[in-house]
């Protein structure tokens, strides 16, 4: 299937202040957006794709000045793909607090003339959804045919169906969870601690020092990658294979240099991430993950939290995902069924762990394709 081709982001400016869940207010902010496909005359074929931790508005296609800059879900979104841009108008939004052009810690604080840094307020999934709703308003979209996301993106999709029930026809929630477990919060805390303890962090104001806390970011990403892969996947990819510069395959160096293939992989991923991502953004987004818990206001009762939803749902999980295990998706399914909502659920037997939602698995893509075929028939796309 062909790619959507060359795409270009656009920056949307919002003068009306946005009050955050914390009570802080962000004024005169901007959000970077990409769109794919055409909005029909009835404005009924719009789909919002919500991004996960380190992704962005750049969902599909490539940039003219960088043909290697393929969108993070290019295998899912495009002409003839499961989310077919010949039929749907797809929007990707870079969330507040991110580091890819939307207002965030790297932006200039108008009150000081300097980057916000650590002074940028903590944001939540709910704050992002409110900001995304303003994007929908700007496009004249009263109701999305679907809101879709994987992992943290799935949390946003679920939040949309809770916060704007009349504006979401279908919620597609993949490899996600209704709240983080204590173990997941612990992983995030270790990652944040690595960043906060980096001497180059400078209390979050490292921009003024001309440095980045790369060591902390590197470790944070390495921790994350361990949780994104399954044990079986890591065993198949790396096993206990050694990586030796001299070509020796069965001898140890008896040092603390990189010796195992899995060590090399983690360091490579950490180095790559530290080059392009912002540490303050990492702190913000992991805290937003921690805080997401729509049942909290209902004494932990997820069924009560979902009582006012109106959307139809597709919930999908992956058998080897231990970051957000299938049992967490089934919690959502049960709560929706308790409310007599229309729910489709699939647990896909895939070996790749949490990252499976990003990969080109035929069974998974066929599931999404079939569901969008149903939506297309409903909206005449």
Curated annotation (Swiss-Prot):
The active site is at 151 (nucleophile), 321, 354. Its EC number is 2.3.1.46. Pathway: Amino-acid biosynthesis; L-methionine biosynthesis via de novo pathway; O-succinyl-L-homoserine from L-homoserine: step 1/1. One of its GO terms (cellular component) is cytoplasm. It comes from the Bacteria. Keywords: Acyltransferase, Amino-acid biosynthesis, Cytoplasm, Methionine biosynthesis, Transferase. InterPro entries: AB_hydrolase_1, AB_hydrolase_fold, HAT_MetX-like. The record marks 323 as: Important for acyl-CoA specificity. Gene3D superfamilies: 1.10.1740.110, alpha/beta hydrolase. NCBIfam families: homoserO_Ac_trn (TIGR01392), PRK00175.1 (NF001209). This is Homoserine O-succinyltransferase. It comes from Burkholderia multivorans (strain ATCC 17616 / 249). The gene is metXS.
């Amino acid at each position: 299937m062909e790619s959507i081709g060359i795409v270009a982001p656009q920056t949307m400016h919002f003068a009306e202040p946005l009050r955050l869940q914390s009570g802080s207010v962000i004024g005169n902010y901007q959000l970077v957006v990409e769109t794919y496909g055409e909005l029909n005359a009835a404005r009924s074929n719009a789909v919002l794709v919500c991004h996960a931790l380190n992704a962005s508005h750049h969902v599909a296609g490539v940039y003219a000045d960088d043909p290697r800059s393929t969108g993070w879900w290019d295998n899912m979104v495009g002409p003839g793909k499961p989310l077919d841009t010949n039929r749907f108008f797809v929007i990707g939004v870079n969330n507040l607090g991110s580091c890819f052009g939307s207002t965030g810690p790297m932006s200039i604080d108008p009150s000081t003339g300097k980057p916000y840094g650590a002074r940028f307020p903590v944001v939540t999934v709910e704050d992002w959804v409110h900001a995304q709703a303003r994007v929908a308003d700007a496009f004249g979209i009263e109701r999305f045919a679907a809101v879709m996301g994987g992992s943290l993106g799935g949390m946003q999709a679920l939040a949309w169906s809770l916060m704007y029930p009349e504006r979401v026809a279908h919620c597609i929630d993949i490899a996600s969870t209704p709240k983080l477990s204590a173990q997941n919060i612990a992983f995030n805390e270790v990652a944040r601690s690595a960043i906060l303890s980096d001497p180059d962090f400078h209390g979050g104001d490292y921009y003024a020092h001309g440095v980045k806390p790369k060591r902390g970011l590197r470790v944070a990403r390495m921790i994350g990658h361990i949780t994104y892969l399954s044990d079986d996947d890591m065993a198949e990819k790396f096993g206990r294979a050694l990586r030796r510069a001299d070509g020796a395959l069965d001898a140890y160096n008896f040092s603390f240099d990189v010796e195992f293939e899995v060590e090399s992989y983690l360091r490579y991923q950490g180095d790559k991430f530290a080059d392009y991502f912002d540490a303050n953004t990492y702190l913000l987004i992991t805290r937003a993950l921690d805080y997401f818990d729509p049942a909290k206001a209902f004494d932990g009762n997820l069924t009560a939290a979902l009582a006012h939803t109106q959307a139809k749902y597709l919930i999908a999980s992956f058998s080897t995902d231990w970051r957000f295990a299938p049992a967490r998706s089934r919690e959502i399914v049960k709560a929706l069924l308790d409310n007599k909502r229309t729910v489709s659920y699939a647990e896909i037997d895939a070996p790749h762990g949490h990252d499976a939602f990003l990969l080109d698995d035929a069974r998974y893509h066929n599931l999404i394709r079939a569901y969008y075929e149903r939506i297309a028939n409903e909206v005449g796309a």
